[in-house]
């Protein structure tokens, strides 16, 4: 079987490596960080998504359930008013831990990859256009949100601006609180899992204001009793929503996977499911590009209407109208939670493959 190079040991890169190694390919993964888990300043951090765990196992061949927990408590703060989500829908929201700890999803995937003979080389950054050009054809690129990859490969993106903090908690609850307010046209959140806590406020395209960041910090401290002392600005982030044409499986003579390939919800940025499933699609592309393209097309078919919906929402709904619209929707949500969650999950890139 062939030698395959993968750039990035995140979710999609490792799923691709596991699949290819299982088929007899010799796989080398180049990871810029010194250990598994991605950007150390971010980790460990919990991250949530709707999952069909059995469907993910069937599609990828990897059981991620040991690293996944159902979200027990969820609420949304909309311009200062709190709305509790029942979390009784048939489609469940799960949380996974990202990072290098034994409880992290990254570690689970890394251990599975190594057990199948995958060679992961740490401290191997691939950053510049020249770096990428030197890689062999059919190299799989899985570099996620890193700005340098978008610029080196000339892939459209929206810059991400964030303000985040992490810490620990004295409980083991899996919970999330989302924040919508005048400090961002996107949102922020606070979450806990496995005894760690994480909070972030982010916005695409426009930097966050100093006043907005301070307001969010105060709200998290008051509402969640979370007095973080290590708030930092997120630097160098990018997301593949710079163009309606962002989704791509092939780029030149390379294969693109994960967030970089555009398998992400352009409205709320849910992308973990797409990262996992697209890893398997990238692996498929090594042996059968036509079949892989058909799977990728199915995975990303909801990207385009959601991209248009987000653009229309930002253009046509003024800030003054967002508060009553959001509050009205959240008041109605518990009564139609099952239907809403089903439709929401069905629009996340990748869900229709399960």
What kind of region is each of these model predictions?
Residues 1-12:
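Beta1/beta-strand and adjacent pyrophosphate-binding region of the FAD-binding site
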Residues 9, 21-43:
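Glycine-rich FAD pyrophosphate-binding loop
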Residues 48-51, 87-111, 207-211:
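Short beta-strand to alpha-helix junction loop
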Residues 311-354:
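C-terminal auxiliary extensions adjacent to catalytic cores
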């Amino acid at each position: 079987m062939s030698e395959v190079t993968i750039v990035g040991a995140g979710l999609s890169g490792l799923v691709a490596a596991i699949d290819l190694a299982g088929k007899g390919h010799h796989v080398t993964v180049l990871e810029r960080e010194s250990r598994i888990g991605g950007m150390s300043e971010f980790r460990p951090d919990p991250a949530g998504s709707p999952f069909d765990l059995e469907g993910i196992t069937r599609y990828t061949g990897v059981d991620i359930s040991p690293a996944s927990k159902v979200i027990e408590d969820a609420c949304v703060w909309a311009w200062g008013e709190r709305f509790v989500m029942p979390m009784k829908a048939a489609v469940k929201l799960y949380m996974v831990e990202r990072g290098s700890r034994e409880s992290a999803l990254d570690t689970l995937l890394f251990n599975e990859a190594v057990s199948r003979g995958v060679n992961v080389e740490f401290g191997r950054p691939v950053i510049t256009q020249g770096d990428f050009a030197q890689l062999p054809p059919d190299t799989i690129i899985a570099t996620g949100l890193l700005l340098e990859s978008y610029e080196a490969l000339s892939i459209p993106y929206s810059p991400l601006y964030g303000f985040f903090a992490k810490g620990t908690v004295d409980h083991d609850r899996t919970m999330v609180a989302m924040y919508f307010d005048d400090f961002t046209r996107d949102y922020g959140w606070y979450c806990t899992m496995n005894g760690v806590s994480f909070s972030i406020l982010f916005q695409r395209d426009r930097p966050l204001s100093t006043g907005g960041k301070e307001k969010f910090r105060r709200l998290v401290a008051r509402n969640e009793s979370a007095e973080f002392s290590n708030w930092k600005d997120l630097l160098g982030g990018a997301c593949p929503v710079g163009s309606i044409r962002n989704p791509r499986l092939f780029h030149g003579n390379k294969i693109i996977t994960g967030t970089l390939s555009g398998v992400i919800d352009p409205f709320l940025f849910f992308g973990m499911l797409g990262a996992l499933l697209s890893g398997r699609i990238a692996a498929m592309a090594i042996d059968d590009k036509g079949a892989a393209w058909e799977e990728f097309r199915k995975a990303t078919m909801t990207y385009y209407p959601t991209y248009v919906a987000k653009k229309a929402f930002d253009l046509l709904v003024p800030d003054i109208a967002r508060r009553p619209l959001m509050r009205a929707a959240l008041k109605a949500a518990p009564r139609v939670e099952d239907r809403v969650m089903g439709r929401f999950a069905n629009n996340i890139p990748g869900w229709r493959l399960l």
